[in-house]
Amino acid sequence: MAEDKFEQAKGNIKETVGNATDNKELEKDGKGDKASGKAKEAVENVKEKANDVIDKFKGNKGD
């Protein structure tokens, strides 16, 4: 998950520098990095929630 946050931060820096220097390519790359980091983070969150549900199901299975 830390990698996802790092990718988002890296994207934010690229986007900001690209915007400040009027470098549209760098700005676009930054936006892509941010989106990719957010998507990966969302997938990880879904995996964690699914595993929580599975663990609860397994724990209650013998009741």
From Swiss-Prot:
Stretches for region Disordered: 1-46
Comp. bias intervals (Basic and acidic residues): 22-46
InterPro entries, alphabetized: CsbD (IPR008462), YjbJ_sf (IPR036629)
Pfam families: CsbD
Protein name per its UniProtKB record: UPF0337 protein SERP0494
Species of origin: Staphylococcus epidermidis (strain ATCC 35984 / DSM 28319 / BCRC 17069 / CCUG 31568 / BM 3577 / RP62A)
Family to which this protein belongs: Belongs to the UPF0337 (CsbD) family.
